[in-house]
């Protein structure tokens, strides 16, 4: 239950900027063994003994460590109080993720709040997927980018106000991997309300 002012302060903070850029706050460095800097997206590994060629393509542009630590700090208290039941939060909560393992939409209503929120905003290529209950999860917008159906089904709502913050998708081009993948995997924007009352 963060107030609008608290949320605005978080979104305007250096910590939030670090989440989006992957820059790790100095206070977290002792959690990791420092590795040699490598900005490559693609690595080619050769095993000379067996002459095996195994290409490796990185699944993320931005490292998620800062986001994971920040979410741990922000949501651990709520996890503890709610006993991992999102209906027991001050405001009951749902979020939608994409279960990559089974190729389907998954509505998260329990478990780790930080993991659920992380999954629901993990866009392919930008962040690497998160594993929940053994399955890889990405942003739920791949299957359902306006989940009013979930809200109508799980909650007794009187009225829904839905806001689309999506921008029109760029046309895919031959030399832009991001726009090509975005057009392939993200469901076209839809704003259908499944309840009787709403805008």
Question: What spans do the regions from the language model cover?
Answer:
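Patatin-like phospholipase
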Residues: 2-199
